[in-house]
UniProtKB/Swiss-Prot annotation:
Entry protein name: DNA-directed RNA polymerase subunit epsilon
Listed Pfam families: RpoY
Function: A non-essential component of RNA polymerase (RNAP).
UniProt organism field: Bacillus licheniformis (strain ATCC 14580 / DSM 13 / JCM 2505 / CCUG 7422 / NBRC 12200 / NCIMB 9375 / NCTC 10341 / NRRL NRS-1264 / Gibson 46)
InterPro entries to which the protein is assigned, alphabetical: RpoY
UniProt record, GO biological process: DNA-templated transcription
A cellular-component GO term for this protein: DNA-directed RNA polymerase complex
Gene field: rpoY
EC number(s) given by UniProt: 2.7.7.6
MF annotations from Gene Ontology: DNA binding; DNA-directed RNA polymerase activity
Reactions that this protein is recorded to catalyse: RNA(n) + a ribonucleoside 5'-triphosphate = RNA(n+1) + diphosphate
Alphabetic keyword roster: DNA-directed RNA polymerase, Nucleotidyltransferase, Transcription, Transferase
The protein's enzyme class: transferase
This protein's record includes keyword Transferase: yes
Signal peptide: none
Length: 69
């Protein structure tokens, strides 16, 4: 499954909506996504499973890249 993760790059700062980034991660569960990203010290805001029409739409973006962690 592919998950879209909304995050702040630094866990040490107060979250600011304008600094939110997103990445795509392949994993079997939300828990696995969190464990894969733990070493990066991201401030994870939201994790969303991406499938079906939503996945096809995201694939059209030039920024679509699934991280292999």
């Amino acid at each position: 499954m592919i998950y879209k993760v909304f995050y702040q790059a630094s866990n040490d700062e107060v979250p600011v909506r304008e600094k939110t980034d997103s990445i795509f991660v392949e994993a079997q569960s939300e828990r696995e996504v969190r464990s894969k990203l733990k070493p990066y010290n991201y401030n994870i805001e939201f994790i969303q499973q991406v499938e079906g029409a939503f996945l096809e739409y995201e694939k059209q973006s030039e920024n679509f890249k699934v991280l292999e962690l």
